[in-house]
Amino acid sequence: MIISASTDYRAAAERRLPPFLFHYIDGGAYAEHTLKRNVSDLSDIALRQRILRNMSDLSLETELFGETLAMPVALAPVGLTGMYARRGEVQAARAADSRGIPFTLSTVSVCPIEEVAPAIQRPMWFQLYVLRDRGFMRNALERAQAAGVTTLVFTVDMPVPGARYRDAHSGMSGPNASLRRIGQAITHPHWAWDVGLFGRPHDLGNISTYRGNPTGLEDYIGWLGSNFDPSISWKDLEWIREFWKGPMVIKGILDPDDARDAVRFGADGIVVSNHGGRQLDGVLSTARALPAIADAVQGDLKILADSGIRTGLDVVRMLALGADTVLLGRAFVYALAAQGEAGVANLLDLIAKEMRVAMTLTGARRIADIGRDSLVSLP
């Protein structure tokens, strides 16, 4: 299959992956209205074309939390990334490292912190959930610090798991799910050989290191599901802010008042996000939520954004709406599933190329030049 655009990787991933895995990353909550609007609202935003601006010295570089990024992009935390390619977190981290951007390891990664961090040169970011088992949280934070993690991404929009109906249809969950997954793996021999056989162990590395005695991936997913904490409040985050001395980013902000609370809390950054449309269907797309949040807190902390970003043009649109940096989630997993580390590296090259074209034709020589005046319309 020819890959000529960043969006080509989705079809390539669908061909390679068993349906239960493809639809797990591709799907969203309930009827998936927010999932769809994340993409459509962003792609509907019109950029303002400018000409004859001497764009010969264009640069994508930016600064974030004391780091120089080759472009204002980081790879988002995505659970089970190691099921999409053999030791997938390591492959994705290496690709990000080679292109000069951060990689964020998920709490529910297949590869543990101690396997991923030594595989790359630049400091890694780590994502953590609020769980009932505070001992696990402290253990994860201590291990992250020991591994040289610089930035903590704290996900707060998952006090309960979202209802993802597509998973029951695809075989990720529901009746006879294990048998259905085995049948799907048999009909996808490349994945079965590369990941199903040689990608073991298939557990959640960060959790198995803490719990020990693994009894299978489903056991860990069950433990995680029972540990999400609906009683979470800002007060529950105070001990983490005291413990974690590096940059701390609150992920899952969709309302300006919550963004202001993050400033008062002392967060270094926020991620404007609806969890890729995977939690509460019917909420605002990130593109629609971002402008008001940026107006409320820009300059008080760093603003990151995710959900719906598929191309370099989308990156420029998010920056124009008020983001300092964006996180890529599904887009990099599609590329990883299709072509491994090389696929993620190529995706990032395509994103950078698309950004350069968009910036050249909107008259923005530097990332700081991208703003609301780069747009004809807001979402």
UniProtKB/Swiss-Prot annotation:
Gene Ontology cellular-component terms for this entry are: plasma membrane
Signal sequence region: none
Keywords in UniProt for this one?
A: Cell inner membrane, Cell membrane, Flavoprotein, FMN, Membrane, Oxidoreductase
Topology relative to the lipid bilayer, per the entry, is:
Peripheral membrane protein
Annotated GO biological process: aerobic respiration; lactate metabolic process
Q: Which family does it belong to?
A: Belongs to the FMN-dependent alpha-hydroxy acid dehydrogenase family.
Name this polypeptide is given: L-lactate dehydrogenase
Tell where it localizes. Answer: Cell inner membrane
Q: Does the keyword Membrane apply?
A: yes
* Residues the record lists as binding FMN: 106, 127, 155, 251, 306-330
Q: Which organism is it from?
A: Stenotrophomonas maltophilia (strain K279a)
The reaction(s) catalysed by this protein are: (S)-lactate + A = pyruvate + AH2
Q: Has UniProt tagged this entry with the keyword Protease?
A: no
